[in-house]
Amino acid sequence: MEKTLAVNAGSSSLKWQLYEMPEETVIAKGIFERIGLSGSISTTKFNNEEHFRKQEIVDHRQAVLLLMDELIHFKLIHEFREITGIGHRVVAGGEFFKTSTVISPEVLAEIKNLSTLAPLHNPANVLGIEAFQRLLPDALAVAVFDTAFHSTLPEKAYRYPIPTKYYEDYSIRKYGAHGTSHMYVAQEAEKVLGKPLEDLKLITAHIGNGASITAIEAGKSVDTSMGFTPLAGVMMGTRAGEMDASVIPYMLESDPSLRNAQDVIDILNKDSGVLGVSELSSDMRDLSEAVAKGNPKAILAYEMYVDRLKKFIAQYFGVLNGADALIFTAGVGENDTAVRTDVVNGLSWFGMEIDESKNVRGAFGIISKPESKVKVLVVPTNEELVIARDVEAAK
């Protein structure tokens, strides 16, 4: 039986799902966390069982070796060659990659070159690709790009209002991210709403530690909040999101500990957002606990977070000239009842009314009242399934 592995490699993590294809049956899934850090742990789930293993994991290559060892140990596979395809999530494809692509040496080199567009992500994606290539050299490897879904953006949306030469000579433009997730939840919403995707105007809110909002018309991305890199857009767990670019040179001039622009970018990427304002955590669960205890910095961080989500969602009502539905997905979007309530109530003048009993349950489907002019949905994302499907399509 042929099996396909969907892989999402982060800077210190490796998330995976093993599928039986083309049936799309999930055999097992898991994650390696804190790779290269203290307290490394792996989680493997199958047959309603959950297995944990704590041990030092120094790099992605070791994580891949441990993963294959666990698949054999738990008899999820009997030999490596049962895995005939591996799909890798790659965040930035630039203008070069507009569809999922079989990984060749040339493709891998270009993914490395595009790391400037996703400095937190593409290097980690490359580590995952190279680690699996060493262990499973005969498996078909496919790169699935976060930016591909946004290749339909009109020029008025993806161009920045800067001199044209910077676009033509240096490809400086909006690329977006989380495209695989936005595409998947839009397709799932079509089933719930009972209308063809071609007839729908949707606003999708992928809200996790990283977050982005996308305007979708007739199944195509027409605008999105992330930009040249995933730093742009709404306030995120550790990323600042949208802000005045003049802050960068001012921070350099003001803080003698900062050596160059990259130091500032690192702060905006890794030490800002919810973490930077709350000075507590990048995790919304931690923030919610602190808000409940009256922590003023946590309260401010939460208010800023919700406010920026509302601003981008409101913008996209204008871009689409109205919308049929607002869709929440990803870690915060799927699980944080308060964020959904405060965002929707803050946009009630668009005709959205949340049903609190449905919102508290947070189950897949509509969580707005029947009379709500704009439907509000919770749709769990499944980027791994999209990745597995794209591998199958490439065979």
Swiss-Prot record:
Coiled-coil stretches are none
Q: Which GO terms describe its molecular function?
A: acetate kinase activity; ATP binding; magnesium ion binding
Q: What is its EC number?
A: 2.7.2.1
Q: Which Pfam families match?
A: Acetate_kinase
| The protein's required cofactors | Mg(2+); Mn(2+)
Residue positions binding Mg(2+): N8, E383
Write down the top EC class of this protein.
transferase
Instruction: Write down the InterPro entries for this protein, in alphabetical order.
Output: Ac/propionate_kinase (IPR004372), Aliphatic_acid_kin_short-chain (IPR000890), Aliphatic_acid_kinase_CS (IPR023865), ATPase_NBD (IPR043129)
Annotated residues for binding of substrate: R89
Instruction: Give the catalytic activity.
Output: acetate + ATP = acetyl phosphate + ADP
| Keywords of this entry | ATP-binding, Cytoplasm, Kinase, Magnesium, Metal-binding, Nucleotide-binding, Transferase
Q: Which residues form the active site?
A: D146
- UniProt remark on cofactor binding: Mg(2+). Can also accept Mn(2+).
The answer on whether this UniProt entry bears the keyword rRNA-binding reads no
For binding ATP, which residues are annotated in this chain's numbering? K15, H206, I207, G208, N209, G210, D283, M284, R285, G331, V332, G333, E334, N335
Pathway note: Metabolic intermediate biosynthesis; acetyl-CoA biosynthesis; acetyl-CoA from acetate: step 1/2
Q: How does it assemble?
A: Homodimer.
What is its biological role?
Catalyzes the formation of acetyl phosphate from acetate and ATP. Can also catalyze the reverse reaction.
Identify this protein by name: Acetate kinase 2
Species per Swiss-Prot/TrEMBL record:
Lactococcus lactis subsp. lactis (strain IL1403) (Streptococcus lactis)
